[in-house]
């Protein structure tokens, strides 16, 4: 059997990953030993390379991904049926800083972006309608329909309404989270102009909400309270939108250094190849971007469980370490407060793709942020303040997490997937496939194929092409989700509904 049929990710690992479906009785050569497979094993799944007694930790990526439920033999297929998570409740952590310097040359790369009055840079120039409450979603959609029909979107990239179900019947922190995300959307540099659309009687009171925007561009962000309109709110809304559109239409792209890029890092529909191909590829890009003075953000906090100490020890200082500890333990408390185990994460699709425990998933997930030091930690709804690698508090849910990344200020999101997904958030959401079969079967979903990494293509060559692709999308090339019209927002609900 050829070595290319398997991969051992870390020298310390007690499993290898199959790069193709393998049959019972086939043999593999690992560390000078010949091992016979004891079961048929799908591609992306794990095979044990040493006997393991019950309770023995099983290592992948050089770290435990759980322990053996029973005694296991070398050659066995390791999956959720014989592997159990080690995760439990909150933990105490010790700061053991790791200072790894990135040895990546700085390049004078640019992209063509829209420089806003406040100095922020957008990769799109769009007109948005942002409802303060779900009650006016229909009005928002109708206004967008009318403006599209009247203008054909000529001279801008898109016109869109970001409908949601919130803005009323919420209390305390839950209500505040909604307000913060909607504020962040209104202030996003991918918007050339925004109509804030209010009903008037909602909990998210329009005047208070507008104060949250701070020192905003009053020419480019306008408010319409529909209950205050005497007559047709559509007619009044169109008057405002025509003016906003006319202003946005005058904006032009210009060369901007890549240091102005803010990129979100996300995975969903992950499989056993995610931590081998797409996530390391995105990690290489993240390191490159940070070395250029740019910014990347990693979220999906529950999918850090089991890999969190790696991130904690990469924090630039003790203050950031403490914030990361709270980031992790606060989310564990969130699970426990609902009576749910912290390790109950891998989905049926994850398991079918070769991910058996949350540690298995987390150690692959965190490959997306490369090796750069952690320079910032953000709470849900916070806007970026620090360049470099940031961590953001948000759940693993694809729609919620991607919206949170964009709300924090990311102009685009890199989304790795092994199973495939069509969705996109309110910024370009590039899909990177972990395997070539997905890229071949779903070219209408996938922007870039990382599966080539297990087919003989060198990482440095693929990273170069990946950088070119991202710069092209940042400069105006449509991501597949944009081409398909798959764009939406989802806000994290964490509280009672009145």
Describe each model-derived feature in a short phrase:
Residues 2-412, 419-422, 427-498:
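Metallocofactor- and cofactor-centric catalytic cores in central/energy metabolism, strongly enriched
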């Amino acid at each position: 059997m050829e070595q290319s049929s398997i991969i051992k990710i870390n020298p310390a690992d007690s499993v290898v990953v199959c790069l193709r479906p393998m049959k019972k009785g086939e043999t593999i050569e690992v560390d000078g030993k010949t091992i016979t497979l004891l079961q048929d094993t799908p591609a992306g799944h794990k095979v044990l390379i040493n006997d393991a007694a019950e309770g023995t930790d099983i290592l992948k990526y050089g770290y435990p991904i759980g322990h053996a439920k029973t005694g296991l033999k070398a050659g066995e297929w390791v999956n959720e049926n014989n592997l159990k998570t080690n995760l439990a409740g909150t933990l105490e952590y010790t700061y053991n800083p790791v200072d790894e310097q990135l040895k990546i040359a700085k390049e004078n790369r640019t992209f063509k972006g829209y420089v806003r009055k406040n100095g922020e840079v957008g990769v799109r120039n769009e007109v948005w309608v942002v409802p303060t409450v779900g009650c006016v979603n229909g009005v928002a959609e109708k206004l967008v329909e009318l403006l599209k029909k009247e203008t054909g979107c000529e001279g801008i990239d898109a016109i869109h309404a970001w409908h949601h179900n919130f803005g009323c019947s919420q209390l305390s922190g839950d209500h505040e989270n909604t307000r913060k995300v909607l504020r962040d959307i209104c202030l996003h540099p991918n918007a050339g102009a925004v109509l804030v659309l209010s009903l008037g009687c909602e909990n998210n009171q329009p005047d208070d909400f507008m104060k949250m925007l701070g020192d905003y561009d009053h020419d480019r962000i306008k408010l319409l309270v529909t209950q205050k309109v005497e007559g047709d709110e559509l007619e009044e809304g169109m008057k405002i939108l025509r003016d906003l559109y006319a202003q946005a239409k005058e904006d032009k792209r210009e060369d901007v250094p890549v240091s102005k890029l803010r990129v979100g890092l996300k995975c969903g529909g992950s499989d056993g190849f995610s931590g081998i191909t797409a996530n390391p590829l995105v990690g290489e890009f993240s390191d490159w971007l940070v070395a250029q003075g740019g910014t990347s953000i990693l979220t999906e906090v529950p999918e850090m469980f089991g890999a969190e100490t790696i991130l904690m020890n990469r924090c630039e200082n003790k203050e950031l370490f403490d914030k990361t500890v709270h980031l992790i333990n606060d989310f564990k408390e969130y699970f426990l407060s609902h009576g749910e185990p912290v390790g109950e994460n891998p989905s049926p699709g994850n398991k079918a793709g070769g991910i058996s425990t949350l540690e298995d998933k987390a150690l692959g997930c965190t490959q997306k942020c490369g090796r750069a030091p952690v320079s910032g930690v953000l709470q849900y709804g916070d806007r970026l303040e620090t360049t470099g690698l940031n961590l953001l508090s948000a759940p693993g849910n694809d729609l919620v997490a991607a919206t949170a990344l964009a709300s924090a200020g990311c102009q685009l999101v890199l989304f790795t997937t092994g199973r495939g997904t069509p969705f996109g958030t309110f910024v370009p959401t590039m899909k990177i496939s972990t395997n070539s079969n997905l890229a071949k079967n779903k070219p209408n979903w996938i922007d870039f194929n990382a599966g080539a990494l297990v087919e003989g293509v060198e990482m440095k060559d693929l990273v170069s092409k990946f950088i070119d692709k991202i710069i092209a999308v940042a400069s105006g090339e449509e991501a597949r989700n944009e081409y398909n019209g798959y764009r939406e927002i989802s806000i994290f609900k964490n509280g009672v509904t009145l």
